[in-house]
Amino acid sequence: MRVKVALKCSQCGNKNYYTTRNKDKRAKLELRKYCPKCNAHTIHTETKA
């Protein structure tokens, strides 16, 4: 089953992206994405949507 999650910037805390992930995986998603508030590519971590 897939669940909706938000990706939050690790520097400013802004929720910039929403995606889905497999619920069976235990580790949190960590992706390097662009943050418009920071104006840079930063690590975004998974949070509840």
UniProtKB/Swiss-Prot annotation:
Transmembrane segments: none annotated. GO terms for biological process: translation. Disulfide bonds: none annotated. Keywords: Ribonucleoprotein, Ribosomal protein. Signal peptide: none annotated. SUPFAM superfamilies: Zn-binding ribosomal proteins. InterPro entries: Ribosomal_bL33, Ribosomal_bL33_CS, Ribosomal_bL33_sf, Ribosomal_zn-bd. One of its GO terms (molecular function) is structural constituent of ribosome. Belongs to the bacterial ribosomal protein bL33 family. This is Large ribosomal subunit protein bL33.
